[in-house]
Amino acid sequence: TNKPKFFAHDIVEATLSTYKPAFLICPDDTGKRKPEPDGLILACKKSNTNPKESFYIGDHSVDIIAGKTAGMKTIAAAYGYVPLGEKAEDWEADYMVSSPKEIMHLV
């Protein structure tokens, strides 16, 4: 996320009560915000995965840029917080989905 860790941690705690992620990566961890890919690359290192074998799902153009720069396949989430005046289909993601269920057919 591009949110500061103190803020993002509270959001994760409040919204993901039944699922606890293994880790949370924020700009505090890398010193850089998306569209820089540093956070995504760190996530791959922490999870022992290859970016070229990974998907990055985003609801903002900077997410797609970061994912592509990191070497990942990208999925534009048209159902997320797409900024007013933008269209997810304009972000040039590898895939676009309109609901979380559609992601399961891609990964």
Model-derived features with residue positions:
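Asp-based, Mg2+/Mn2+-dependent phosphohydrolase catalytic module
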Residues: 5, 9-107
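Conserved phosphate-coupling serine/threonine residues in phosphotransfer and NTP-handling enzymes
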Residues: 1-3
